[in-house]
Amino acid sequence: MESSGAGAEDGLMETNPRRPTPDPLPDVIIDTALQVHRDLGPGLLEHVYEVVLARELELRGLKVQRQVPVPIQYNGLHFREAFRADLVVGNEVLLELKSVEEVSRVHSKQVLTYLKLMGLRLGFLLNFGAPLLKDGIERIVLGYVPRSTRER
């Protein structure tokens, strides 16, 4: 009897396409950001958190780019450095850092715009000005609309 698919007999495991393997990168980023905030506390300038977080992520073996140009093209015009993203980790996750008392909707929209312009899917808005960083983390996924804002 012949088998048309891979199975346990040939040592291959089948994967469930509905359950993708979780990406550990976001967890490493958040754990590192939480540690930086615990060590430094709130109240410093955004630039300090950017430098320290980039360094800590690099020490964990991740590729980190700082102040990454966000290009814009419009009707033949090319703006190569119209904006700058604070950090891009592993060429796939954008980090926008703030050190403010409270973030506003415009900050979230900024991250979403950067994701679109850079062709990335996942970003985090990290507010190091929050007393507890866990309260200052916003995960932003391009194309995801939170249930509370969907039309019914």
What function would you assign to each model-found segment?
Residues 58-75:
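A short acidic/basic microdomain associated with nuclease active sites
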Residues 29-38:
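A short, surface-exposed helix-loop junction/capping segment
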